[in-house]
């Protein structure tokens, strides 16, 4: 129970000027790690929120709040990243403990980047506004992960802790494991009870809840728990708001899952009670590393979007968490625009011309299922003109963006598969829709448009050896070469050869 002094302090901390970590501090459960690319989580914080690295010259810079306690300076990012690409290389810890999150190393599973590291996130995949001010979240595709295996002050063993994260309830999958929280220091699976992390997704391999998901669950290692029992727990609802508050806490023989809409309303308790009655979970053996977007053993097949989150020392009360939720709602998260520069109109038919010098007579076309570039002009055959013409439709996975249907093969769309662009029939699956959705942005070379993958925002339409790929600006694939990248990912939008 709170003393009168702490109740008064909590009431003061819940004012608009306070941040989530001020509220936890007033509740005697201070933040030991605080991460956000969108805003300061303390009213007095004015330091760096995150670090960017741009693709043009690999220079880095840091992004801070516009004012102490305020929203991130998105304009500084936009200026730094103009006409190139940017990755988020560090998410800084605001607590003062130095628990920064950096590119996750290999562990039980290798990542897809150099030397088995996980990928870094695009800086522009999750635009939002907070109280009308632009900011960017962390859109994490499969293979993306951040970690700190040498964290300070985080709970170990059976010590009590709490945590929350603001996540996107529309961006998820059923792979392991989109987590934020406490994990192993070795990046390997060291056994049941060695983790305590928030999970959001629709995996049913271990635990699951009511409906089709996604669900907030707790990753305690070797199991995702949605309640007291392994497997199904009806008290854990599907939660698919654009902005989800997920709150988890654990102590000696107790733990809880709470959640709600981060844009309105209060938190609900989905489970609060004793630890799971299975070997390894009571007492717990937490190790104190911090992960984001991955499992404790570096399982990296999951996807999701992270906006802010903290970890605390001590088991926060429901009252404290309720006040934090009020603060989050007061931040007024709203989804931002995924589109910039010249755009498209759903229903129009276009041809897309290469702008790379020496290749400007070539257009995006297809030969059977292979998407490529071919020389096309008014004297070309009707067949080739149709193969180089595309009907623009509203994005199959996101209505802000677009999908491209073949004129000569109705019902088939450009999609990425293993980062090659293919023409495949729409099979109606969530995976296909995500693979076939692309967001136009201001062209990186100033000509036409650049088309960014919605599901892998580090990757763009790129012609390479006359074949189309979803390519990044530098990377492990041959077609990720930085040479001529800006030209190769920029295409002029022209009247279609055929309709």
Curated annotation (Swiss-Prot):
Residues that hold substrate according to the record: 219, 222-223, 296, 416, 418-419, 435, 463, 465, 468, 488
Tree of life domain: Eukaryota
Cystines in this chain: 21-31, 81-86, 176-177, 401-439
Region (Catalytic): 19-335
Enzyme class name: hydrolase
Coarse class of the protein's main subcellular location: secreted
Cellular component terms per the entry's GO annotation: extracellular region
Alphabetized SUPFAM superfamilies for the sequence: AbfB domain, Concanavalin A-like lectins/glucanases
GO annotation terms (biological process): arabinan catabolic process; arabinan metabolic process; arabinose metabolic process; L-arabinose metabolic process; pectin catabolic process; xylan catabolic process
UniProt-annotated glycosylation sites, renumbered to this chain: 83, 202
Site (Cis-peptide bond): 176-177
Keywords: Carbohydrate metabolism, Disulfide bond, Glycoprotein, Glycosidase, Hydrolase, Polysaccharide degradation, Secreted, Signal, Xylan degradation
Compartments in which it is found: Secreted
Reaction it catalyzes: Hydrolysis of terminal non-reducing alpha-L-arabinofuranoside residues in alpha-L-arabinosides
Enzyme Commission code(s) on record: 3.2.1.55
Signal peptide: 1-18
InterPro entries assigned to the protein according to its UniProt record, in alphabetical order: A-L-arabinofuranosidase_B_cat (IPR015289), ABFB (IPR038964), AbfB_ABD (IPR007934), AbfB_ABD_sf (IPR036195), ConA-like_dom_sf (IPR013320)
Region (ABD): 336-499
Listed pathway(s): Glycan metabolism; L-arabinan degradation
Function: Alpha-L-arabinofuranosidase involved in the degradation of arabinoxylan, a major component of plant hemicellulose. Able to hydrolyze 1,5-, 1,3- and 1,2-alpha-linkages not only in L-arabinofuranosyl oligosaccharides, but also in polysaccharides containing terminal non-reducing L-arabinofuranoses in side chains, like L-arabinan, arabinogalactan and arabinoxylan.
Similarity section: Belongs to the glycosyl hydrolase 54 family.
Name of the protein: Probable alpha-L-arabinofuranosidase B
Gene: abfB
